Amino acid sequence: MAVTGACTNKKLYLAAPRGYCAGVDRAVVTVEKALEVYGAPVYVRKQIVHNRHVVETLEGRGAIFVDELDEVPDDALVVFSAHGVSPQVKKEATDRGLRTIDATCPLVTKVHHEAKRFANQDTQILLIGHAGHEEVEGTTGEAPENITLVQTPADVDGLALDRDRPVAWLSQTTLSVDETVETVDRIRDLHPQLIDPPSDDICYATQNRQHAVKQMAPQCDLVIVVGSKNSSNTGRLVEVALESGAKASYRVDNAGEIEETWLDGVSTIGVTSGASVPEALVQGVIDLLISKGWPPAEEETLIEESLSFALPPQLRKRRTTAK
């Protein structure tokens, strides 16, 4: 992955794929389209995606973000975020007569369906994920009596499971692929008959972005990951960069958060971004680094992504392009 035409030993690499995934694009466009069709305000339960810039931009267009439905006025329109909600939240909205649009990523919805199917078979479900994350809360709500949360491989040894009932595992869609494999292997050591989900729960975009960083990181003195602090998949990219050989890796919301000391003695920098990050924020980082003497970025595409998801039924007649 050589940089051509640069009269310097400095190198700048740009990982691909990066940034928006199909689920994020669908969720952001859902709010934009709802504002266009129904007018402001449009309420959104939780952040539509975990990116500060996206949320602030939508707020400027008339979206109002709330933590819970009791903050939403009667008869208002509310959008459920890409991370999904529990059946209890949907019932609360129905009971109050709120108009709703569900922007849950279809890949998260798939995990919800798997949880319900396993629960209907009286299967114990080990959900690998992060406590407090909206996606984990939504999935747990589908089968609360069957699901036990497992956050790390170390949690496995303390599990108290019924040996007479089957055990299956599911996962949050934005986890580290390697750590999830380690956790599943640990579970299977104790429960050899462990049942796998029908297909990977970790989404294609999470896996692709991690694989792209793995390819880039060994060549880098520094990997900069663009994304917000509360973005799970962004945090995992920092971890993957360090585990894959980068000498240092930091997360930034935008170019303004890059510290000068990070660049001291650094010649090779890699840049990537989480799945809810607009490309403009990545370009801002590239522009800053070029202004400080790095050559134009060399991009190598690991895999082309072409997946897209249909908008929620209420909004399918006309579609706008996400900015």
UniProtKB/Swiss-Prot annotation:
Its EC number is 1.17.7.4. [4Fe-4S] cluster binds at C21, C105, C203. Keywords: 4Fe-4S, Iron, Iron-sulfur, Isoprene biosynthesis, Metal-binding, Oxidoreductase. The active site is at E135. Binds 1 [4Fe-4S] cluster per subunit. PANTHER family: 4-HYDROXY-3-METHYLBUT-2-ENYL DIPHOSPHATE REDUCTASE. Pathway: Isoprenoid biosynthesis; dimethylallyl diphosphate biosynthesis; dimethylallyl diphosphate from (2E)-4-hydroxy-3-methylbutenyl diphosphate: step 1/1; Isoprenoid biosynthesis; isopentenyl diphosphate biosynthesis via DXP pathway; isopentenyl diphosphate from 1-deoxy-D-xylulose 5-phosphate: step 6/6. It catalyses: isopentenyl diphosphate + 2 oxidized [2Fe-2S]-[ferredoxin] + H2O = (2E)-4-hydroxy-3-methylbut-2-enyl diphosphate + 2 reduced [2Fe-2S]-[ferredoxin] + 2 H(+); dimethylallyl diphosphate + 2 oxidized [2Fe-2S]-[ferredoxin] + H2O = (2E)-4-hydroxy-3-methylbut-2-enyl diphosphate + 2 reduced [2Fe-2S]-[ferredoxin] + 2 H(+). One of its GO terms (biological process) is dimethylallyl diphosphate biosynthetic process. It is an enzyme of class 1 (oxidoreductase). Disulfide bonds: none annotated. Its cofactor is [4Fe-4S] cluster. Isopentenyl diphosphate binds at H50, H83, H133, S231, S232, N233, S276. Signal peptide: none annotated. (2E)-4-hydroxy-3-methylbut-2-enyl diphosphate binds at H50, H83, H133, T173, S231, S232, N233, S276. The gene is ispH. This is 4-hydroxy-3-methylbut-2-enyl diphosphate reductase. Belongs to the IspH family. Dimethylallyl diphosphate binds at H50, H83, H133, S231, S232, N233, S276. InterPro entries: LytB/IspH (IPR003451). GO terms for molecular function: 4 iron, 4 sulfur cluster binding; 4-hydroxy-3-methylbut-2-enyl diphosphate reductase activity; metal ion binding. It comes from the Bacteria. Catalyzes the conversion of 1-hydroxy-2-methyl-2-(E)-butenyl 4-diphosphate (HMBPP) into a mixture of isopentenyl diphosphate (IPP) and dimethylallyl diphosphate (DMAPP). Acts in the terminal step of the DOXP/MEP pathway for isoprenoid precursor biosynthesis.
